[in-house]
Amino acid sequence: MTERVQVGGLQVAKVLFDFVNNEAIPGTGVSADTFWTGAEAVINDLAPKNKALLAKRDELQAKIDGWHQARAGQAHDAVAYKAFLEEIGYLLPEAEDFQAGTQNVDDEIARMAGPQLVVPVMNARFALNASNARWGSLYDALYGTDVISEEGGAEKGKGYNKVRGDKVIAFARAFLDEAAPLESGSHVDATSYSVKNGALVVALKNGSETGLKNAGQFLAFQGDAAKPQAVLLKHNGLHFEIQIDPSSPVGQTDAAGVKDVLMEAALTTIMDCEDSVAAVDADDKVVIYRNWLGLMKGDLAEEVSKGGSTFTRTMNPDRVYTRADGSELTLHGRSLLFVRNVGHLMTNDAILDKDGNEVPEGIQDGLFTSLIAIHDLNGNTSRKNSRTGSVYIVKPKMHGPEEAAFTNELFGRVEDVLGLPRNTLKVGIMDEERRTTVNLKACIKAAKDRVVFINTGFLDRTGDEIHTSMEAGAVVRKGAMKSEKWIGAYENNNVDVGLATGLQGKAQIGKGMWAMPDLMAAMLEQKIGHPLAGANTAWVPSPTAATLHALHYHKVDVFARQAELAKRTPASVDDILTIPLAPNTNWTAEEIKNEVDNNAQGILGYVVRWIDQGVGCSKVPDINDVGLMEDRATLRISSQLLANWLRHGVISQEQVVESLKRMAVVVDRQNASDPSYRPMAPNFDDNVAFQAALELVVEGTRQPNGYTEPVLHRRRREFKAKNGL
């Protein structure tokens, strides 16, 4: 039983109450009485509104299900369907024109374009690595990944391989020639870098000296001007640093003594309380809030063991340089942090309201993450986050403008409780639910003075696409979904609406995750599509990926690209409403088996770690042993696709069970080296994780909007109770 403290009409878990009063509040200038009294009023006033919004979701879904059921066996009538969606208030009239009015936004969001990380804030090590991923070694990112081929004697090996190292150096020199070209000659032939008379001077192997074609790209240096340790350059708004140390192992092999190129990489990071964490009770929530507090105060630290030694990882300090005129230049040493709160769906028993009901978790997150961020606003931190006095909160899984307006109201109420100026709390709107996509302009308008981010999350969005049209028929296979008409229109619509509502210069227009952290050569080839599509940020799965994805923002001037895209014909809502139904379901038995096995394996690989270990985001080997980043969004697609095929008779429940059992053996094998792993086979009936996976598919049509959280939370609590955790 959870030990609770009565606070007014609220029953607060003691572990949360003690954390808030003893750790979070001191230093904020907010008294405990003021906070809890205000929190109770917010909960009492807004929890019923939250509940009503969820009822509206269910009501609309039931009407859509009924419409499709009444037309079973008939060809889909797109015109009648659209009229029906308008009639029931799902598709609303387009909002009148407006421009976003957000103020006090940090440059990383408003004026720069670059990679964005998303990490589970529940894991302090991941959180620190991401915070420090603002700057990343290009040499390490190239040497340690498949971007550099291992052919021709360039294997990674255990020690330093000079053949591979030379390929890395050649790649980096080519980057320098592209991003900071010389007036004459090439960085390939550089023999030294120095600063003379306020300019960068590059000596070449033919004995001549040259400078940058655009002298303004040189900003500053570290060390002695005649023999600098680092030279700071800027291109397309992003910084990078040529690091020089002729005595280092790599510098010894380089004609100019260059040991690395340090890239400005993850400009922003989302510290996630949502899809990448497994937090089901007060104890879990306090872990999340405590880590967020450490980030906001700048004192988060974690003991890390690597290569037989242990050290303490902390947040990096700012970077300090000397300008050409001798003055000091300081650059932000860390990624600018957002925090992603949970959406409107779930409740959490960390707090019970006056009637003994669990309080909506999104309201709790809004109150606690904002309270904690006051430490940064007050300067009660050794590692400043926002320089403009803002708190950046990503709000996921909102369905339509009413829900965006509710978030705006919640944030206003939280500001009042905490004594913050209006619109201090900024909002990032995840465009990952269909009703938000088709009404995106109205959603942005509902938070037009807070919006700092819109982002397409195609994974969740696909899950909602399947669930919304669950009764329409069998959908295409998962691999075919990306080439369906709706998805291209959805991605373009996000950019079109963002530009039309004046987000450029005020907010990020973002794109989704590269989910294969080991396949960096493919990422380097393909993910340039995101900046070309007009996104000034896109998600990457690791600091290394952030360093490599930064290269794309040197190849594409995103703000110029946005200006071009603003002139195109906007995406069509009719295209967005095109349901991804399979033209026929005459797949071969082998094709069906492969699809079921692939999804079953992905579901199990993720769910078993979620339920048994409380891991909400991990690299899960797929059926071909390719590591894929999985979180609840990928789980939503896989479970909804199988539920859809089950609903329409493409597969049977027996096939699902048989595949899950077979794939459980595969997942057990893939996790055999993990000493804390508990095998699912052969005791399937008594294995909580296996039963959770089965329930997600078999009961998939009945899950609210296809979300996986209700099953996962209940089953994780069951596992914790069963094992005394």
UniProtKB/Swiss-Prot annotation:
Entry binding sites for Mg(2+): E432, D460
Main location: cytoplasm
EC supergroup of this enzyme: transferase
UniProt key word DNA-binding: no
Compartments where found: Cytoplasm
Enzyme Commission (EC) number: 2.3.3.9
Record-level GO cellular component terms: cytosol
Keyword list, A-Z: Cytoplasm, Glyoxylate bypass, Magnesium, Metal-binding, Oxidation, Transferase, Tricarboxylic acid cycle
Leader peptide range in chain numbering: none
Active site positions: R340 (proton acceptor), D631 (proton donor)
Modified residues (Cysteine sulfenic acid (-SOH)): C617
Catalytic activity: glyoxylate + acetyl-CoA + H2O = (S)-malate + CoA + H(+)
BP terms from Gene Ontology: glyoxylate catabolic process; glyoxylate cycle; tricarboxylic acid cycle
SUPFAM superfamilies: Malate synthase G (SSF51645)
Residues annotated to bind glyoxylate: R340, E432, G457, F458, L459, D460
NCBIfam families: malate_syn_G, PRK02999.1
HAMAP family noted in UniProt: Malate_synth_G
Assembly with partners or alone: Monomer.
Name listed for the protein in its UniProt record: Malate synthase G
